[in-house]
Amino acid sequence: MDKFYNYNSSSNQALLNLKVKPDSKQNLISDFVIINNLPYLKLFIKTAPEQGKANEEIINYLAKAWKLSRSNIEIIKGHTHSLKTILIKNIDEDYLNSIINSYIK
C-alpha cells in the first residue's frame, strides 16, 4: 500500500485512520496496521475512554508530537470506537509525509 492517508491539496487537509488503544501504560505512536485493507496508525493512550477524555488526549498528544495546533486536529469518525478517522487541517503534504514515514516499518 503506497498511501497511508488521503490528502486534499486544495484545502491542505488530510484524513488519517487511527487504531487507538486507550488505558495504556504510556502515550505512544507505534506503526501502521492493515485492517479491512485500510492502513491504521497505531496509537497507545494512557487515558481511559471515559466521557471523551481519551479523545481529548489523542488530540493533545498528536498536536504535541507533530508540532501542530490542537485546532488543526479533529476526530471526525469513531468517537466511541477504537478505530477512528482524524482530519488534519492546514498541513503541508511534504510535512505530513515526513511524519508518516517515521512510523512506516
Swiss-Prot record:
InterPro entries recorded: DUF167, YggU-like_sf
Q: Name one GO cellular component term.
A: cytoplasm
SMART domains xrefs: DUF167
For this protein, the record's Pfam families field holds: DUF167
Source organism's superkingdom? Bacteria
Family recorded in the similarity comment? Belongs to the UPF0235 family.
Protein name from the UniProt record: UPF0235 protein A1E_05380
The beginning of the lineage is: Bacteria, Pseudomonadati, Pseudomonadota, Alphaproteobacteria, Rickettsiales
